[in-house]
Structure formats: structure tokens, C-alpha cells
């Protein structure tokens, strides 16, 4: 009911250098990474798709729990891979992280009520918002102000990206591979284990009861009826209208975890041109590890 997820990731290599010395391979990598994670309750979409007729009465609210975690940061890593023998290789990649921007929205208790007699829609609102960026946010006082700053990301220069005085984090990747014979091998690894500490944050903690939200939600209903659905606009409208686009304030430092991934892989190679691979992974999303299994064939 509360555990629906949308996840997107983007990575751009800016610089990569490497060399080999005997059984040791060393590489330096500088990349820019973006990841976003949205999680929402079943009622969040069901309310718009099925209407509010299923949520009549104060004892039958629509659960509007929703959250987001979006981060943009650069990563400098030094990779070391060592071949112990013909069968076993190990590797480690420590990383320094420099955060550009983060937005975290946590809401676990917002409820939408529909009066069974008047059909007036009200909300009990509970939201926690925190955000940080290397941009100047002295003039940011609301959600709208903060959102507009993200359109200025293309003005960031390299001096700001490499500013190691704020939004610093550390991470590590490590793993090993073992080849049993010419046909069969396995590998295991842990990727993106680490955190970023964000400074100069903006925060908002909003708890309100009986907020009238008819206008905000009816506009979104009309968009759905016209098949004019923009999830970004829908999400923004809810934040501004349901959770209120009022003041946000200066906050303290906070940490966010990287999206850690644990991987176990095995392959069977019939010929150099024919391989079957199985990959089992655990992704860390919304404070839980989520399993995934991939089967691949190449030939």
C-alpha cells in the first residue's frame, strides 16, 4: 500500500585514466551523477484514477503518503584491481563525493477526506522537507523559490563543482571475481556504499488539519479527464497547493545515503560466442533493500 517506487539514475563520465603494472590495474575516474527516487502510497494514484467516491467519510480517508529523494553530485574515484592468480581477482574503489544539490521530501501521514454529504475535500497534512545546493539560496523563502533555482543549474561553473568546503561525502565500491574453469565463473560486489553531508540547508516542517483542497485536486481531475497528464506538474501542484507553498527556513547539516547496490553474478560460457548470465541484485531504496533478478543470453 505504501511502497510504490519510481527510480531514475544518470551518470556522465567526465574524465577517465588508467594504467596496468603487472597484476595491478589502476584507474582514476571523475563522473557526474544524478539519481531520483519517488515513493508513494497506492491511494495517491488511485484517488485520481478512480475518483474520490471510494474515500467517503471521515473513517475512510485516501492515504496520500508520498516522498522524494533527488541528488546531483560529482564523484572522484581511484580504482584498484589486483589479479591474485589466474582464477581470483579483487578490487576496491574509494570515492570522494561533492554534492551539487539535494531535495528530500518525507510525508507519511497526509490524509484526504471527502465529506459524504457535501463532498468537500479536506486534508490532514504532515510533511517534512529539506534541501541543499551549492547555489546561493539566501533569497529562497518558499517551495516555488527553491524550484526556480534548479533551472539555473546550467550556470554552475567548475570552480563551484569542485568546491570541497561544503557538501562533502565519501563512498566505496568493492568486489571480487572467481573463474572456476573455462566455462564457469562468479562475481560479487558492493557498489555506492557511502553518504553525502549537506550544508546550507532549507527546511520545512508542516502539520495542519482540515485544510480545504477542493480547487487543487479538481484541477488535477480535469487534466486526467482531458488525458492531459503531466506527473511533474501533478506532483508540483500537490506540493504547492495541498502541502502549502509557504515559508521554508534555514536549517542545519544533514546526511543522505547513496543508493547502495549489492550484486552476485554467475555465468556459464558454452563457447566464446555463447554465454548465459544470471545476476541477483539488492537495491537500497526508501530505506529498504529491494531484490532484482536478471537473466541474460548472448550469442
Which sequence ranges carry the predicted segments?
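Subset of outer-membrane beta-barrel
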Residues: 1-299
Amino acid at each position: 500500500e505504501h511502497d510504490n517506487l519510481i527510480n531514475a539514475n544518470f551518470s556522465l563520465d567526465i574524465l577517465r585514466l588508467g594504467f596496468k603494472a603487472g597484476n595491478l590495474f589502476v584507474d582514476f575516474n571523475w563522473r557526474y551523477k544524478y539519481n531520483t527516487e519517488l515513493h508513494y502510497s497506492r491511494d495517491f494514484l488511485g484517488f485520481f484514477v478512480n475518483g474520490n467516491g471510494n474515500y467517503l467519510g471521515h473513517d475512510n480517508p485516501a492515504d496520500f503518503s508520498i516522498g522524494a529523494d533527488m541528488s546531483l553530485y560529482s564523484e572522484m574515484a581511484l580504482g584498484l584491481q589486483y589479479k591474485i592468480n589466474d582464477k581470483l581477482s579483487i578490487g576496491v574503489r574509494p570515492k570522494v563525493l561533492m554534492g551539487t544539490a539535494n531535495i528530500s521530501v518525507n510525508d507519511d501521514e497526509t490524509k484526504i477526506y471527502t465529506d459524504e454529504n457535501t463532498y468537500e475535500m479536506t486534508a490532514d497534512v504532515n510533511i517534512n522537507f529539506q534541501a541543499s545546493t551549492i547555489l546561493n539560496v539566501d533569497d529562497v523563502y518558499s517551495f516555488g523559490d527553491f524550484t526556480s533555482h534548479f533551472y539555473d543549474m546550467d550556470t554552475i561553473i567548475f570552480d563551484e563543482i569542485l568546491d570541497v568546503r561544503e557538501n562533502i561525502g565519501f563512498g566505496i565500491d568493492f568486489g571480487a571475481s572467481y573463474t572456476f574453469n573455462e566455462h564457469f565463473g562468479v562475481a560479487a560486489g558492493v557498489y555506492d556504499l557511502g553518504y553525502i553531508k549537506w550544508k546550507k540547508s532549507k527546511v520545512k516542517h508542516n502539520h495542519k488539519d482540515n485544510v480545504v483542497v477542493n480547487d487543487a485536486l479538481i484541477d488535477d481531475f480535469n487534466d486526467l479527464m482531458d488525458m492531459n497528464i503531466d506527473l511533474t506538474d501533478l506532483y508540483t501542484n500537490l506540493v504547492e497547493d495541498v502541502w502549502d507553498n509557504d515559508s521554508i527556513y534555514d536549517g542545519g547539516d544533514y546526511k543522505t545515503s547513496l543508493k547502495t547496490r549489492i550484486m552476485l553474478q554467475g555465468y556459464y560460457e558454452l563457447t566464446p560466442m555463447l554465454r548465459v548470465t544470471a545476476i541477483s541484485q539488492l537495491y537500497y531504496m526508501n530505506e529498504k533493500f529491494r531484490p532484482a533478478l536478471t537473466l541474460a543470453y548472448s550469442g
